Curated annotation (Swiss-Prot):
This is Fatty acid elongase 5. One of its GO terms (molecular function) is fatty acid elongase activity. The chain crosses the membrane at residues 24-44, 60-80, 100-120, 127-147, 150-170, 188-208, 214-234. Its EC number is 2.3.1.-. Pathway: Lipid metabolism; polyunsaturated fatty acid biosynthesis. It comes from Trypanosoma cruzi (strain CL Brener). A motif (HxxHH motif) lies at residues 132-136. It holds the Pfam family ELO. GO terms for biological process: fatty acid elongation, monounsaturated fatty acid; fatty acid elongation, polyunsaturated fatty acid; fatty acid elongation, saturated fatty acid; sphingolipid biosynthetic process; unsaturated fatty acid biosynthetic process; very long-chain fatty acid biosynthetic process. The keyword Transmembrane helix applies. Disulfide bonds: none annotated. Involved in the synthesis of fatty acids. Elongates C20 polyunsaturated fatty acids (PUFAs) with a preference for n-6 PUFAs. The active site is at H135 (nucleophile). The lineage of its organism: Eukaryota, Discoba, Euglenozoa, Kinetoplastea, Metakinetoplastina. Keywords: Fatty acid biosynthesis, Fatty acid metabolism, Lipid biosynthesis, Lipid metabolism, Membrane, Transferase, Transmembrane, Transmembrane helix.
Length: 253
């Protein structure tokens, strides 16, 4: 049976509301240490790989992609029932189920950092964009902030759900192409990623007016963060399109 609490009860706890025993995982030492450590690791690994040949990571990538597909599917399916509770679950009640799966989603952001490690070992330096590093160095920190302040709940479920659903599609694509197959829907996947950011911007814009459980600063944080992601992703997509066009032009000369 689902367990619910009023949002005000969770605010007063100033910690995970239903699972306080997990607070250690969203402590400042973990939040700051893990994300600063990520940036330091990127710098060290890139320097270490400078004079080394690219490594064959095919088997590891296959295991990694399958793991990501499985975890993303479980999170998306587990959070999906809350989609029926109104638009973005605005003013939705705080539940143990949402908090648990948002915590799992938060933990998955640390697994996502392995994307960067794989890119560096494979010497895919063109993929190590500012957008990529910025996203991985910040998204887990933001989810951790929500959880440690007792508001990783309610309408916040939507961000975790839509991101899990998109990640399921993304890692399915990566697995498919790693097996040597071509995905004709790759361009659609890019549009889906951008639509995800757009939906989160809409949610953050509506929350101050239709959700009285979230303080304005949290909606503002989500709004500004997803606007930066949308702009950076749009710029990266535009530049990638230009580079692809130049490569195609050279091949026809």
């Amino acid at each position: 049976m689902e367990v619910y609490l009023d949002a005000t009860e969770c605010y007063l706890k100033n910690s995970l509301c239903f699972y306080p025993s997990l607070n250690i995982f969203v402590s400042w030492s973990v939040l700051v240490g893990a994300h600063v450590g990520y940036i330091v690791l990127v710098i060290i690994l890139r320097k270490w790989m400078q004079r080394r040949a690219a490594l064959n990571m095919n088997k590891i990538m296959m295991i990694y992609n399958v793991t990501q597909i499985y975890i993303s599917a479980i999170m998306a399916i587990s959070l999906a029932p809350h989609l029926k509770k109104g638009l973005f679950n605005l003013n939705g009640r705080f539940s143990a189920n949402i908090e648990f799966w948002i915590f799992v989603h938060y933990c998955s952001k640390f697994l996502d950092m392995f994307d960067t490690v794989l890119m560096i070992f494979r010497k895919k330096n063109e993929q190590l964009s500012f957008l990529h590093i910025y996203h991985h160095a910040t998204i887990g920190f933001i989810w951790g902030l929500l959880l440690r302040n007792g508001i990783g709940n309610g309408t916040a479920f939507f961000g975790a759900w839509v991101n899990s659903a998109v990640h399921f599609l993304m890692y399915s694509h990566y697995l498919w192409t790693s097996l040597g197959f071509r995905n004709p829907l790759k361009s659609i996947l890019t549009k889906i990623q951008m639509f995800q950011f757009f939906l989160c911007i809409v949610q953050a814009s509506l929350a101050p007016f239709f959700d009285n459980q979230f303080a304005l600063q949290w909606s503002f944080l989500q709004l500004t963060y997803h606007i930066t992601l949308f702009i950076l992703f749009l710029d990266f997509h535009r530049k990638s399109g230009k580079k692809k066009g130049l490569r195609n032009l050279k091949q026809t000369e």
